[in-house]
Amino acid sequence: MKTSLRRLRGVLHKHESKDRRDLRALVQKDELAQASQDVEDMRDCYDSLLNAAAATANSAYEFSESLRELGACLLEKTALNDDEESGRVLIMLGKLQFELQKLVDKYRSHIFQTITIPSESLLNELRIVEEMQRLCDEKRNVYEGMLTRQREKGRSKGGKGETFSPQQLQEAHDDYENETTLFVFRLKSLKQGQTRSLLTQAARHHAAQLCFFKKALSSLEEVDPHVQMVTESQHIDYHFSGLEDDDGDDEIENNENDGSEVHDDGELSFEYRVNDKDQDADSSAGGSSELGNSDITFPQIGGPYTAQENEEGNYRKSHSFRRDVRAVSQSAPLFPENRTTPPSEKLLRMRSTLTRKFNTYALPTPVETTRSPSSTTSPGHKNVGSSNPTKAITKQIWYSSPLETRGPAKVSSRSMVALKEQVLRESNKNTSRLPPPLADGLLFSRLGTLKRRSFSGPLTSKPLPNKPLSTTSHLYSGPIPRNPVSKLPKVSSSPTASPTFVSTPKISELHELPRPPPRSSTKSSRELGYSAPLVSRSQLLSKPLITNSASPLPIPPAITRSFSIPTSNLRASDLDMSKTSLGTKKLGTPSPPLTPMSLIHPPPQALPERADHLMMSKQERRI
């Protein structure tokens, strides 16, 4: 009975000692876990402090460099001031910037002394604590490994495995406890000094800032009386609005609540949102206008209500969507008519625009019976010429493109001006080559000295200057059509006549004159007038020369009747086919130039109403 009680008492003592060891191990594990968390928190704190100190030092360096550049600029600009007092103040302000630069550099060095260096020292201490934590973890792993192997040996039946004596286990346990104690104690000491070290760093940094701003303020106050004196003498209010505003914080809070970013403190405003909306509206309007007119291939005339101030805006909008919208039109942009611009300025602008892009107009081949796209006129030319013949001539003589179909011309009841208009209008209707007309079918073309050239580019609706035409006239040969609607049969000529190029000719078509003699071909390219653009590009670009020398025209082949002059005026019987001096080789050129003849006698001031006086006799042509 006594033996059993002793055994029970011994078992109880063993269990109590085991429970104490387990409780001590749990306490050590909790302390190590808390110590590890404290190490991480301290590392994060010092890392953030070092980052802030580095950012402050970098900003101070940039501020120092900016002050140096500002001071150098002020010292360089002092030579521009004629006032001696102003120059002296600028020199003082420039030197002040250099003094502030030195103070900023000192403050930057104080940042390193007060924050960066102490924080790095504390981080080094923290690294030592982390190393102690690593050793403590190793000791714990060794002790726990020994205990695990000892237990496995007792459970195994064969007794195989490494055996440890109780002394070895006790030594391992003691080493682990010693390392844990040192680690926890060192960590607690470092944690208690963390608050003190942070307070020391902040106080020393405050002293550095106070020293910096005090010295900077004293330097600024030394220069302030001189600046104030100069500004008062020149009536300059250098204390701008908002400089000493006590309600600045309240305004910032109100603006944050309202979501507004605009301050009404007299500062400059860079608010462009309203302008952006207006520009977007204009762009959208311009885009819709461009899309609406994308299928228009010819210029349009602005209405009479178009204002002058809208010209530049419309011109800008016509180009705004050109990169984005692929329109069908390849013509020039639409130019509204400006009623206040003089016609001479319009002519100069149109001349410079057209002559810069185009050179000459190539006539189509005889087989082309339909109108080419480039020879279609603007709708604005339909109603030109009936009310005012002079304006119609000045508007239409610039273009070789065919105009719209007109009614039959009444030669016997029109004046000379109307005849000129009809000739020019009908001569532009067709560009195919026709048989030569009668030799006597010479008539006067338009009066004036304006250079008439043709272009294949877009036709604009701006009128030419309405200047009085000079009295000097030149003879041009061409038919006067009677019925532009009816068609004529193919003309047959004598076997000795030059071959003709006919493709279902109309009465309104322009007849081609025979090529002049070789001696007058070189001079004819420099004459002023043309009944159509019939010369090559190189000849058209040459500088025209005005000459009054006469050059006789050759006698064309005989034709039974004319297609452009009434039958009562025909003189086909007077033609002599044996004197034709042109061959088929010279008529092969696409567009021979026409040589105008100068008048022996001055031209009459007013011509009779009848078209019979427009004819010249055969004897005068042979002079």
Swiss-Prot record:
Residues 328-343, 384-393, 496-506 have a biased composition (Polar residues). It comes from Arabidopsis thaliana (Mouse-ear cress). Residues 590-606 have a biased composition (Pro residues). This is Uncharacterized protein At2g33490. Residues 364-379, 484-495 have a biased composition (Low complexity). Residues 243-259 have a biased composition (Acidic residues). Residues 148-170, 240-343, 362-393, 454-531, 585-607 are annotated as: Disordered. Residues 24-51 form a coiled coil. It comes from the Eukaryota. InterPro entries: AH/BAR_dom_sf, At2g33490-like. Keywords: Coiled coil.
